[in-house]
């Protein structure tokens, strides 16, 4: 797989940069929950639909990935994890094997921040800006 094909694959599947999110979307709502688990953390993503997302764990670089339909992706981290999903259709998210609630099925982006530093899970749902 050469990098150009990989880039095209992400564009085809709806890659969203932080700038695109800021310029093209507004926050519909934000919810914050207490983080009740302790480090180290394991996040498992499961979906019935092919889903693009980007993620950053602890102080590592931002990465992009695609979950093929019916598959799971798993990540471990100690302090923080940020995950941006293009959509949450048929998406389930688990932290240390406990499902994170509040991820209703939607075709709009969602940003999830899990922070051991703040002892919180923050969920932000976005909607397209009306110009």
PLM features: residue spans?
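Extended low-complexity, proline-rich intrinsically disordered regions
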Residues: 1-131
